[in-house]
Amino acid sequence: MYVTAPDRVGEVQLSDGRLLGWAEWGPPDGTPVLFSPGAATSRWLGFGAEVIARLGVRLVSVDRPGLGASTPLPGRTFADFVADLRQFTTMRGLGRPAMVGNSQGAPFALACAEGGITAALAIVSGADEVAAPEFASALPAELRKLVDWTVRDPADAERFFAGYSADALLDFILSGSPECDLAVYREAGFAAAYRRALNEAFAQGAAGYARDTVLAMSPWPIDLGKISVPVDVWYGELDQSHSPDNGSLLTARIPGAEHHLVPAIGGAVLWTHAEPILSTLLTRDGA
């Protein structure tokens, strides 16, 4: 069993009146771990179903603006998300929690680490900074064109991404996944949870997903060298979707970060290796 339905769901109202949707798994008095989920998967897709309670983790997933239950914020930035999470952690009594950033949620989690929101961070199958000059010759031709277009004309690229649907995104993800990942994604319980998460993420349309994607594909205004909390970077060695070098350069750019390359799995490593990911994170957080 890779995932279960959330134990608790709700929304908080921010100071400007917007809502942020959230979901929680695990004991309410457990060690808080914020979760920044992947592309358009919303608060409904968690991880660590069989280990969260045993580890005493209170996993808290948050919908980014425009996704799921969170109010849209057109033109939002990474800094806006950090400000939202600063309010959210205070309102939910989370203190300075550890955090997990998965896939396209990774740069948002890194921004939170730079902004002092988190006490420790795990990046898992993180969407890398594909606009970084070091990757100019390493990207597949089609991805290179897409990145160049996004950098050159982000508004036009955002309109293109806003044409995506839950079905189109799911087809794209499955078509680029190795068999070891498909074994996870096609498991009945996971497939149902994944579909629900995607449907909720696109409930307000695709604008939230489009904004996320433009931010992730553009040069990041995040000073990775200023991150001072413990960071672990996890990739499956068969992952060909998230980083040109499975996070080697990303790890090197973050002071003191540790790189973990997991054999025989790809982008589904968050669900197949939830226990070592969370156990390591709790150690870094001092829990």
Question: PLM features: what roles do these ranges have?
Answer:
Residues 79-98:
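Conserved acidic catalytic loop of the alpha/beta-hydrolase fold
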Residues 18-71:
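Conserved HGGG/HGGXW glycine-rich cap/lid loop of the alpha/beta-hydrolase fold
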Residues 96-136:
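Conserved hydrolase catalytic core segment
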Residues 1-24:
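N-terminal cap/lid segment of alpha/beta-hydrolase-fold proteins
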Residues 141-222:
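Alpha/beta-hydrolase
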Residues 256-287:
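Catalytic active-site module of serine/aspartate enzymes centered on a nucleophile-bearing elbow/loop
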Residues 227, 233-235:
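Short beta-strand/loop motif that positions the catalytic acidic residue
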Residues 240-246:
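Conserved alpha/beta-hydrolase "acid-adjacent" motif
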